[in-house]
Each structure stands twice: as structure tokens, then as C-alpha cells.
Amino acid sequence: MSVKYIFVTGGVVSGLGKGITAASLGRLLKARGLRVTIQKFDPYINVDPGTMSPYQHGEVFVTDDGAETDLDLGHYERFIDENLSKNNNVTTGKIYWSIISKERKGDFLGGTVQVIPHVTNEIKNRIYLVGKEGKTDVVITEIGGTVGDIESLPFLEAIRQVASDVGRENVVYIHVTLVPYLSKSGELKTKPTQHSVKELRSLGIQPDIIVCRTEKRLSKELKDKIGLFCNIPGEWVIQNLDAESLYEIPLMLEEEGLANIVCERLNLGCVKPDMTEWCELVNRQKNLSKSLTIALVGKYVELHDAYLSVVESLNHGGIYNDAEVKIKWVNSEELTEDNLEETLCDVDGILVPGGFGDRGIEGKILAAKYARENKVPYFGICLGMQMAVVEFARNVAGLKMANSSEFDANSPHPVIDLMPEQKDIDEKGGTMRLGLYPCKIIKDSSAYRIYESELIYERHRHRYEFNNEYRELLTSKGLILAGLSPSEKLVEIIELKDHPWFIGVQFHPEFKSRPNRPHPLFKDFIRAAVERRYKQQENKND
């Protein structure tokens, strides 16, 4: 069977959920026995989002091979349960970087380098490349941005050409649009969708399927109207209603018949999907019997997308433990000695995620101190681990001026320091310790109990590490170095003695958690938090 290509575009406004639509369709096709991969094209000129502010871009998702990518790749991996690579996220910056490099080498033999054919050919090559990896049956490609954006034009022209290259029978175009509801008149308005499709058709792309984001159900008459004006059957107009949980959306789109239409259009046969596991997952999530509160202490808390994978991983752990996880967003810049007790006294666990820069670090250190002293389950990820080490050094080991050299280059006790191989690097983009690395776990540790393995592989994104000059002192005071790199030069996991659950990790476990396979650390962190909550309730009742 030849590879099939599905392109997902968006219209009217951004943020409609193209990524979730693509991920959900991927899940539905995989449930039909097809081998699926998903790809995202981002029209911005940055080579990758690694140096972009979380306020502008949200989370940076890291793949096994060390690519810093769009957060939608996290959705893709969680929904289709496959590990993606650097080839699954392509930006305008990457495209132009590649073309200019080729031009400088003389690869174009003196020709004039133009958007068509050179840029469009480079884009198409990236599409075909993922289709050749892993014996893929279906490639789903999401085009970032909105139809009408000047930045998207080369990508739209490239996907138009794909139909000519591989045959129109092997391509499906899906357009995601907004059907707004006017509460005053009680009407759903289709005109924005009509104009968006008109714009897309003016570029040579006739959508096969239109997915309508809406807060109210679409009647058959309304679907037929959209179909009439957009030149498709009314049955191929799909409603995508607001949902309480992201994981309901594949089931809602299955009910609408999206995957069946795609299979019919691509001649993939009519195979009944096996959605048993997914249905059970959603059913469990809807019927959780317990609840708990986790404080997420960070500096980007105004934009929840900055910690998207962490939040999803907490939810995965909650579903596994039959507990609804309520997140208390705590701005680390505003956390002080004066409000520490008041802010954290009602939480069942504290999580300090990764980050960069000195803003808000003292608040994170205070959160680690509160967790240590009050026996509250503490989970430190990347910077969260480093701040736990700084707190321990200051308040347990007596190194009052301890700090990370990232924040205080003149600290007399830099218990966290720049990795040696990073010291001669001037460029910021793509130069950190990135991607999957092994870690050896000592047997007599909580980490070994949780992982049930002496060797694990986790994804990393950092420049700074535990300073080995302080190993002996800090371990003598009760810090456990539970996980090390195979060379034993890098500290990967720290724990505390005499604490119910206090673990810091240099890596990012949130990037490997899946709804059907929660990450072991998140599973056990939530277990410990649930245990603490219900023990406290029992003590109050006594």
C-alpha cells in the first residue's frame, strides 16, 4: 500500500485545536491497525522554539533524539503512543537554513533560488521523509497558523503540490474552523467558515473534510449549509464540541465518523476500531472517587501551557490512582517566608518544574524547604531538583551562601554548576544536553522501588548539573544520590532520608508519560500525595 497523506489546516482564528484534531485522528487510525505518524509545520522563522519565551510559545517538548519542538508533539506522542523525532517538527527557520546551506555549497549549480520550487521542494521532502520512516501507512501533517497568514503560504503551496506528486486519491485535506455562537440571537454563524474555505480554495486546495469547533451542536441543516457553500457533502462536515477532557475528543470524533470518512476517501477499507483501552481510560477519568491538591510552583504560572506535559502527567498519575488532581498554581516570585505556610498548608504534594533564569528561584527554594520540613511529598524536575539541592546545602549542610552558578557566579558554594562541556559554548540554540540519556539507579533507593530497574532512559534539557565537589559533604548530611549517569560523573536523581517522598530528577519524566502508561514517578508521586491526604483526614476524625 502506498503511503497516505492527511493535511490539517486551520482557519478563522488560531488556537482552535488543530493539534488535538490531528492527534485524535491519529489515535482513531491506529485503533484500526494502521501505522501512523504525525508532523507539525510551524511557520515562524526561529529554527526551533528552544530559545523562545514560554509566554509566547508555551512548553518546549523534547524528543528522544534531542529535538526542541512544539508542544503539539506532546499531544501527538500521548495520543498515538509513539516516540517522534526531530523530523516531526519543521519550522520555516529550518527550511531556510537548509536551503541557504545548500546554496552556499553550490548545490543549486548557479541557479536562482526561489520559493517555488526550492522552498516548496524542501518542505515536500520533509513530508516524504517521515513517510519513509518506520514503515508508515499514514502521515498526518498539521500546518501551524491560520489560512491567510503570509508566513503559511509556502507550506500551503507545498501541500497543494503533494496531491499532484502522489495522486489525489492518496491525499486528504482537513480544514479546522470556528463556528461561533451568538448568545444574544441564539445563532451559530457559518460565514467565517465559508470565507476561510474560500481563502483556502483560492490557494488551490479544496478541503475534503471540515471540522467545526463549536460550543453548540450543529444541526443537519447547518452541516448541509456549510457543505453546500464549501463544496463537500454535508456528512463530511464534522462537529468538534468543547469537552471536559482532551481524551474524550477521539471518542467524540469517532462518533461523528471522522476516521470512517478518511478511510473511505483514502481507500483504506472499513475496519472496526479497537477503542476498548481508550474508552476505559475516559470512563475512569470521569468516575474518580478521590481528590487531592498539588501545588505547582513556577514562574510562568499565568500561562498553563508552559507546563502542559507536567499537568498532563499529573492527570495520568491521578487516573491511575483513582484520584482527581487539582492544581494550585503558585507564582514562585510571590512566595515568601511570610506567606509560605498560608500558601502551602492545604496542599497534598509540591511539584517544582523546570525553568531558566534567576527570577522566582528563592520562592522555589522556599517550597523545597517547606516540603522537606513538613514531610510533604516533593517532586523536583530539572531546576526543581537543583533548587532542592541548594535548599539542602543551605539549611541542612550549613552552606548558607550556597547557590547555582547560573544565578550567582560569585557564590562561594556553587553546589549546582555549569557542565564542563558547556563552558566554551557561546550559542544558545540547540546547545544544551538534550534528548535521551541512560541513568543507573542504586538498589537501596525509592527510585529503584518506583522504576523496578537499575537502568533507565530519560529525556534531558539542561546546561547545569550537581557539582561533584559537594557530593561527599551533602551525602554525609543525608542526601541520597539515587541515580547517576553510567560514567557516574552526573547526578541524575536525588532523594532524602527520613522523608515519605522527596525526589528530584535532572531529567524531564513528563515527556515520556502517556495516558494509558503513566510515568512511574508521576504514578508514585500521586500515590504518596493521596496517602498523605487521607492519613491526615483519618487523624482529624480521630
UniProtKB/Swiss-Prot annotation:
Keywords recorded for this protein, A-Z = ATP-binding, Glutamine amidotransferase, Ligase, Magnesium, Metal-binding, Nucleotide-binding, Pyrimidine biosynthesis
Q: Which CDD domains match?
A: CTPS_N (cd03113), GATase1_CTP_Synthase (cd01746)
Q: Does the keyword Nucleotide-binding apply?
A: yes
Q: Where does L-glutamine bind?
A: 55, 355, 383-386, 406, 463
| Catalytic reaction equation(s) | UTP + L-glutamine + ATP + H2O = CTP + L-glutamate + ADP + phosphate + 2 H(+); L-glutamine + H2O = L-glutamate + NH4(+); UTP + NH4(+) + ATP = CTP + ADP + phosphate + 2 H(+)
* Positions contributing to CTP binding: 14, 149-151, 189-194, 225
Enzyme class name:
ligase
Q: Where is the Glutamine amidotransferase type-1 domain?
A: 293-535
Q: Which domain of life is it from?
A: Bacteria
Associated pathway = Pyrimidine metabolism; CTP biosynthesis via de novo pathway; CTP from UDP: step 2/2
The UniProt entry, under PROSITE patterns, shows: GATASE_TYPE_1 (PS51273)
| Annotated active site | 382, 508, 510
Q: Where does UTP bind?
A: 14, 189-194, 225
Annotated ATP binding sites: 15-20, 72
Can you list the GO cellular component terms from the UniProt entry?
A: cytosol
Indicate which residues the UniProt annotation says bind Mg(2+).
Answer: 72, 142
What other facts are recorded?
CTPSs have evolved a hybrid strategy for distinguishing between UTP and CTP. The overlapping regions of the product feedback inhibitory and substrate sites recognize a common feature in both compounds, the triphosphate moiety. To differentiate isosteric substrate and product pyrimidine rings, an additional pocket far from the expected kinase/ligase catalytic site, specifically recognizes the cytosine and ribose portions of the product inhibitor.
Q: Which NCBIfam families match?
A: PRK05380.1, PyrG
Q: List the protein's name.
A: CTP synthase
